[in-house]
């Protein structure tokens, strides 16, 4: 666990899907990847089925930023996404979540990870990038 500006960063797996679902619903509707509430429901169900890894940044017990890592069928490549709620951008979450994504990718022997920052913000935008983690 890591602490960033009074937040706790935890690797959760899909055990925290309810926290993640609530976090996605708190995002600005325009920046929400799955769209409406039904889209969020479907996205969370897909995460459960895919064996995704969830990472949460909790502030006072509430998930305010997150990362999801979704491995492909080979479990050697993955797509990852970072979301941050309004009012929580300038706390270093994007850096910590990106580091956790890379740590988990290495731990799970995932060789290629493509990271997307899904929340729209003028103060923070991570470009899509591909990371090659050379696992031993």
What is each PLM-predicted segment?
Residues 79-90:
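A short, internal acetyl-CoA/4′-phosphopantetheine-binding micro-motif in the GNAT/acyltransferase core
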Residues 56, 61-71, 77-79:
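Conserved beta-strand in the GNAT
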Residues 116-118, 127-136:
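Conserved catalytic-core motifs of GNAT/GCN5-like acyltransferases
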Residues 6-20:
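A short beta-loop-alpha structural element at the N-terminal edge
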Residues 32-54, 58-59:
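Active-site rim helix/loop that mediates acceptor-substrate recognition in acyltransferases
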Residues 77, 105-118:
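Conserved GNAT acetyl-CoA-binding A-motif
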Residues 90-107:
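Conserved acetyl-CoA-binding loop-helix of GNAT-fold acetyltransferases
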